[in-house]
């Protein structure tokens, strides 16, 4: 029984990895059908539906992976690092690095892969970005408590500016068919971003 569950879990992971790879390839710029996905995995469409009731559930699983990866790592940064500027830099670098290492998932983060899917999926990505923005806002607000001095600019504006930078770099990565990596020249870009944090 345990072997059967492991095999099923492995097949589910194989399906999700194939979907992510298809999103990374030129297929990712078009609608991915279950027929194409089944052919990529080497199974029938019926076999796909034994593991996932719908393509929407496949995307849900990928979004769940994105959420878990980013939020868990952001929480680790907040736990381990106390300096506000360093926290912000590491969170931004985390988001950009995650996108760079997972090009197919970046198409989901930018909404590009979700254009032909249910609106609910885009809503989940919107909620993820709202959670990240709320965490950035909290880090910015805690500066006064941690370092004795806050920002002169409203923390809401600063948090949205940081997130807009991340979203812009991820969109540029997708638009360029993954040519312009989000972390390229990050050490040169960060002082420009940090200069806005006043």
From Swiss-Prot:
* Protein localization: Cytoplasm, Nucleoid
Q: Example GO molecular function term?
A: DNA-binding transcription factor activity
By its UniProt entry, which Pfam families does this protein fall under?
A: SlmA-like_C, TetR_N
User: Could you give one GO CC term from the UniProt record?
Assistant: bacterial nucleoid
* Coiled-coil region: 117-144
User: What's the domain of life for this entry?
Assistant: Bacteria
**Does the keyword field hold Cell membrane?**
no
Q: Which SUPFAM superfamilies match?
A: Homeodomain-like, Tetracyclin repressor-like, C-terminal domain
Q: Give the DNA-binding residues.
A: 33-52
Q: Name one GO biological process term.
A: cell division
Keyword Manganese (UniProt): no
- Subunit arrangement? Homodimer. Interacts with FtsZ.
What's this chain's function? Required for nucleoid occlusion (NO) phenomenon, which prevents Z-ring formation and cell division over the nucleoid. Acts as a DNA-associated cell division inhibitor that binds simultaneously chromosomal DNA and FtsZ, and disrupts the assembly of FtsZ polymers. SlmA-DNA-binding sequences (SBS) are dispersed on non-Ter regions of the chromosome, preventing FtsZ polymerization at these regions.
The record's family statement is: Belongs to the nucleoid occlusion factor SlmA family.
Alphabetized PANTHER family for the sequence: HTH-TYPE TRANSCRIPTIONAL REGULATOR RUTR, NUCLEOID OCCLUSION FACTOR SLMA
Name the NCBIfam families for this protein.
PRK09480.1
Q: What is this protein's record name?
A: Nucleoid occlusion factor SlmA
| Native source organism of the sequence | Salmonella typhimurium (strain LT2 / SGSC1412 / ATCC 700720)
